[in-house]
Swiss-Prot record:
TM ranges: none
Pfam family, one: ACP_PD
Protein name according to UniProt: Putative acyl carrier protein phosphodiesterase
GO biological process, one term: fatty acid biosynthetic process
Purpose: Converts holo-ACP to apo-ACP by hydrolytic cleavage of the phosphopantetheine prosthetic group from ACP.
InterPro entries documented for this protein: ACP_PD
Lineage: Bacteria, Pseudomonadati, Pseudomonadota, Gammaproteobacteria, Enterobacterales
Primary gene name: acpH
Protein family (similarity comment): Belongs to the AcpH family.
Organism: Shigella flexneri
Superkingdom: Bacteria
EC code: 3.1.4.14
Length: 143
């Protein structure tokens, strides 16, 4: 949903040539980091932990009809509290390394961590530029 936003396309250009191919994946993880980190500002009336419980309940209703790999992934993500833990950059690095380990074609995800680190402040600025606009569009079903 975010890949075609001008701020996101600009951020993809900040990745080095050897990691640019995985920039969309890395940026999706990074946007989740900022979402988790700034949740209390973005949703002051719905604490993150309550949202996680609510979201889990919603997903659990579709799990019985889902493929086994999706079920296993969800069981792991929920039990490990990923969205809550995304606020920690060390966890983000572990997530990228884990993805790279599971998918050899995505090995560049390991090194994309350095692009995030080098451009952290600029990425956070871009997040604040597009996220409120994206949420307004979503609330009007204009995405």
């Amino acid at each position: 949903m975010t890949d075609n936003l001008p701020e996101v396309r600009e951020a993809q250009e900040w990745f080095r040539s050897e990691t640019r191919r995985v920039a969309p994946i890395t940026l999706d993880v990074m946007w989740d980091h900022f979402l988790s980190r700034h949740w209390s500002q973005l949703s002051p009336d719905f604490p993150l932990q309550e949202f996680v419980c609510y979201a889990r309940e919603q997903v659990m209703t579709i799990l019985p009809d889902s493929p086994p790999r999706f079920i296993n992934l969800n069981n792991y993500l929920w039990s490990e509290q990923w969205l809550v833990r995304y606020r920690d950059m060390d966890f983000i690095q572990n997530v990228l390394n884990g993805m790279a380990s599971r998918r050899p074609r995505l090995d560049a995800l390991r090194d994309s961590w350095y692009d995030l680190d080098a451009h952290y402040d600029a990425l956070e600025t871009r997040f604040w530029q597009f996220y409120p606009r994206m949420m307004a569009q979503a609330s009007h079903k204009a995405l």
